[in-house]
Amino acid sequence: MTLLTQQNIIIFSSIDWSTHWQLHHELTTSLTNSGNKVLFIENTGARSPKSGDFGRIINRIRFRIKSFHGFHQVSDKFFLYTPIFIPYPYSKFAIFINTFFIFSAIKRWTKVTNFINPIVVSFLPTPTIQLIIRKINPTLTIYYCADDMARFAQNPNKLRESENEFLRSSDLIFTTSHKMYERASKFSDSVSNFPAGVAFEKFNSSLKAPSVPEDMQAIEGKIIGYVGAITEVLNLNIIVELATTLSHTTIVLIGPKYINVS
């Protein structure tokens, strides 16, 4: 296997960089550690905003104010872009405006920084992102299908239709589950499945933890732990069933909460 290095890579992310650590962060870190330069473009959304998004919107505005027209150099090989956009991904007017302003900003930045002949990796299949990618005209387009976003989309049919088009047009497609691999393979012969992995050294280091956290010291017996975002993706019914069935086990959820779990 040839190591990818000394390349310019643009990542269109489906999350913001400040979000809890996920596949997107691991990919970016791995690419920069391998000698590539990465422009990480924060989430432009696959749905309209909800009331629960208010905190993230405020954080984005604060970061944008501190940056240079939305761009921020994190390290010598890692650059972050926080775009301002109209949050209606399937409105023709919003698509036109968002495409124009986001692409114009990227074009100016790549020209100034000599960020030429980029490879594009996109976690988003939305119409705006696809139009921007065509305008960039990258040497390679990769759709990283990390989640079935249509399951929770407000407009699942529109998102699915847009994703189908992106599956047909992308040079390479990466999936993270057999189900998504099978679906993507209906539209492309260039699909590879890479299930999410584990950074073993991070998990192994927990065995050497100096002490139990103060807010968990009163827990007796075995613990089933979950670390990650507490969102609609989490099957709360299964968790409740586990808690009821395994009466001598405590279930602990650790992470930012975006849904009501009471």
Where is each model-derived feature located?
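Conserved catalytic-core segment of nucleotide-activated headgroup transferases in glycan assembly
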Residues: I95-F100, A199-S262
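Carbohydrate-associated surface elements
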Residues: K179, F194-G197, S206
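A short beta-strand/loop micro-motif in the catalytic core of glycosyltransferases
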Residues: L39, S169-S177, S192, G225
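Membrane-proximal helix-turn-helix segments that form the acceptor-binding/catalytic region
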Residues: L27, S104-K111, K135, P156-I173
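A conserved catalytic-core segment of Leloir-type glycosyltransferases
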Residues: K50-V112
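An aromatic- and histidine-rich active-site surface loop
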Residues: T99-F103, P118-I136
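A short, histidine- and acid-enriched strand-loop-helix "catalytic/donor-clamping" loop
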Residues: I129, Y144-P156
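N-terminal subdomain of nucleotide-sugar transferases
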Residues: M1-F63, A243-L246, T250
